[in-house]
Amino acid sequence: MPTLYTDIEIPQLKISLKQPLGLFINNEFCPSSDGKTIETVNPATGEPITSFQAANEKDVDKAVKAARAAFDNVWSKTSSEQRGIYLSNLLKLIEEEQDTLAALETLDAGKPFHSNAKQDLAQIIELTRYYAGAVDKFNMGETIPLTFNKFAYTLKVPFGVVAQIVPWNYPLAMACRKMQGALAAGNTVIIKPAENTSLSLLYFATLIKKAGFPPGVVNVIPGYGSVVGKALGTHMDIDKISFTGSTKVGGSVLEASGQSNLKDITLECGGKSPALVFEDADLDKAIEWVANGIFFNSGQICTANSRVYVQSSIYDKFVEKFKETAKKEWDVAGKFDPFDEKCIVGPVISSTQYDRIKSYIERGKKEEKLDMFQTSEFPIGGAKGYFIPPTIFTDVPETSKLLRDEIFGPVVVVSKFTNYDDALKLANDTCYGLASAVFTKDVKKAHMFARDIKAGTVWINQTNQEEAKVPFGGFKMSGIGRESGDTGVDNYLQIKSVHVDLSLDK
């Protein structure tokens, strides 16, 4: 018999747990149909943690049938008030288990427990509380007067069966943002975690069952993207798919939808987000925000301000202080245990990602001969895992691959601009449009930037501060659609128009 559970000990926090390893279908953990497994590795040590069941096409079909039966027979007939009760039950369980869930994120994704993983759980709790309280208060249609004898009304109805594919940089936070919006709207869900980071979502599935959600409403099927992701994208009985990940894979998901049943689609893809620092900004605060916006989560954030443009009159001063802040507050050396409060910058997710980021650093240093600053020598002495020191490249030209490509690590490029028009041109010169930030005390200038920048999110005098009530999504090649807030529910609803004729035959 395949192993469906294992015991995990986290001695640093005195946490012991029974970790599910199976596919979660119809509220039960089960083996994959072919018995294949995936080994998951602790990125802080490079050592294996455990192995979990890997779904295949047959398992996807099994999950779809479970989700379809649950939608047709139970969930579509469940009132919004009752859905809110289930989400409220889930909220209580998340609050009770938040340290365990955060610890699994630290173990499996390398997130520093105290400064990062616990913050993720706080955001998940906020999101769950929002949807639990709002689920029966959304506008689900409107009446439209037409003539004396005719009117129409609209109904917002769920799609039905929704597939969701979540990334490895925010495994549980992204899953909850997608899952809870879809559930609040009345859909059933099949969710695929990233193969690097499946443990927290599998454990979360136990809370789904405890919260009272009927069997088949939420199904968790870990596996490889090339197998499970492809099967979800092409399945003819899935009504909608939501994906977060790279732009390249997002394009494949879009193509799969077009080649199958034209399922509705939401994509949240890559970014190369700019942060603009004007000469009238509070320089110290701007530097603190910009450092946090690229080095937090080891730069593995789709909205990371990986391009920083500074007005030429304060450029040298900014660069000097930015390097000082990076060294003082974000240094990695000797802080290799993400469960230790001293660890602020964790490892990147895998050896593959480590090598990829390293190649960009080497290119910038040797091939492009850019000015470079790192908080520690690299490779870092004593590090067993995939640790990369915060890296700052300065005076970077627009032609540089480091400025054009999404590196997805603690690597930032800094360049200068002369005036507003110059800054805006530089900021918009990218195929991406996920997020942006501007630092200035000039209210008019700040709102002009918000108007003119081609990005789905704009932060003024801060960066990377997402809120549960606020829609999130990208422009251009950064995505299609929005999640979070009321819009995050509308995203999982479709509109039906009803025409009513009141005229009487004579």
From Swiss-Prot:
The keyword Cytoplasm applies. Gene3D superfamilies: Aldehyde Dehydrogenase, Chain A, domain 1 (3.40.605.10), Aldehyde Dehydrogenase, Chain A, domain 2 (3.40.309.10). Pfam families: Aldedh (PF00171). The keyword Mitochondrion does not apply. GO terms for biological process: beta-alanine biosynthetic process; pantothenate biosynthetic process; polyamine catabolic process. GO terms for molecular function: 3-aminopropanal dehydrogenase (NAD+) activity; aldehyde dehydrogenase (NAD+) activity. InterPro entries: Ald_DH/histidinol_DH (IPR016161), Ald_DH_C (IPR016163), Ald_DH_CS_CYS (IPR016160), Ald_DH_CS_GLU (IPR029510), Ald_DH_N (IPR016162), Aldehyde_DH_dom (IPR015590). The active site is at E268 (proton acceptor), C302 (nucleophile). Cytoplasmic aldehyde dehydrogenase involved in ethanol oxidation. Involved in pantothenic acid production through the conversion of 3-aminopropanal to beta-alanine, an intermediate in pantothenic acid (vitamin B5) and coenzyme A (CoA) biosynthesis. This is Aldehyde dehydrogenase [NAD(P)+] 2. It comes from Saccharomyces cerevisiae (strain ATCC 204508 / S288c) (Baker's yeast).
